[in-house]
From Swiss-Prot:
Lineage of source species: Bacteria, Pseudomonadati, Pseudomonadota, Betaproteobacteria, Burkholderiales
Pathway(s) where this gene product acts: Phospholipid metabolism; phosphatidylethanolamine biosynthesis; phosphatidylethanolamine from CDP-diacylglycerol: step 2/2
Protein name as annotated: Phosphatidylserine decarboxylase proenzyme
Post-translational modification: Is synthesized initially as an inactive proenzyme. Formation of the active enzyme involves a self-maturation process in which the active site pyruvoyl group is generated from an internal serine residue via an autocatalytic post-translational modification. Two non-identical subunits are generated from the proenzyme in this reaction, and the pyruvate is formed at the N-terminus of the alpha chain, which is derived from the carboxyl end of the proenzyme.
Biological process (GO), any one: phosphatidylethanolamine biosynthetic process
Quaternary organization: Heterodimer of a large membrane-associated beta subunit and a small pyruvoyl-containing alpha subunit.
Keyword flag Cell membrane: yes
UniProt topology in membrane: Peripheral membrane protein
Keyword Zinc assigned: no
Pyruvic acid (Ser) PTM sites in chain numbering: S182
A Gene Ontology molecular function term of the record: phosphatidylserine decarboxylase activity
Amino acid sequence: MNYPHPIIAREGWPFIAIAAVVALLIHFVAGFGIAWIFWLLLIFVVQFFRDPARPIPTQANAVLCPADGRIVAVETAHDPYANREALKISVFMNVFNVHSQRSPVDGAISKVEYFPGAYLNAAVDKASTENERNAIVIETASGATVTSVQIAGLIARRILCYVRAGEPLTRGQRYGFIRFGSRVDVYLPVGSRPRVSIGEKVSASSTILAEL
């Protein structure tokens, strides 16, 4: 199943509609002098749910960034979803980032696992293992295993994933969404070469995280 990708993410349509109706009603009843703050809220909701198309690098061994945000970890770690040692790269998304998730590589999904959990600040390391999360494990045609984990944050309370085990994914394909601040962890084979560093701002699909 392909993730729907209009300019404004479908997940945001109900929130945008509610914010627009409230702003219009208050504007009609009380005037712009009071309603302006609700118009600002509408603008914020629209920008939060934006979901623009992105250029996709064609480099064969590139692992693309699955989300917009800032790099908060580049380290060797255990991948509990594929049971291996791996290179872990983590992306933290604040409320101003685009919140759709996109596949980092071409491949077939071998596993999708959802885990209920806490709602700690997604920027801290223990969010990777304690927060609500959803992991997909992707097997590439070359035999590499890539794990992408959606992690809920302090404000985010709903992870959406639109793919299932056995389905194919193409690099840059939208496969999920997390509402209101979150994190994505990517686990790669040991020996992969990172192309990003901690603190760096990254963009979904257009930024290369690493080379396999």
